[in-house]
Amino acid sequence: MDELPTRFISSFVVEFISDFMHFCVEKYGFSTEEISIICVVATESTREIRHDGYLLKTYGTEVQAIPDEFRFPVSVQFVCRRLGMRRETTRRKLEDLARRGFLNKIKGGYALPAQTNAADYTQELRDFLVAKISNLRTYIEKIPV
């Protein structure tokens, strides 16, 4: 097979997203908007771990969570622009997610809280995502070359 299996990979990615959404709805009772908001905030507030070798080496495993001082604020404006949501709806949902402990309200916006001990609501989610990536590797290895 000389061509990249784009349809196969695309199908797997869509399944990955669908399963992720289902997991979040079932496990946490999130709405689809809440899942989207948390994804944007988590992605942006932990962006540095993907670009800084020290942070990756120090906090990239399950041994130690990224400390709050390395988590950058994500503004209401950024979230509503990124998701195409109304500002007031975005603000209300962010406040509610912070009130429920899923996000931290910090100076300049919101951040994903450090996931440690009893406060770690994302352990099962991380395990789910890692298993899905492992499944993708298995599927890719089976593609004839």
Describe each region flagged by the PLM.
Residues T58-T61, S75, F102, G108-A131:
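Short, cationic-aromatic polyanion-contact patches
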Residues M1-C39:
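N-terminal leader segment of winged-helix/HTH proteins
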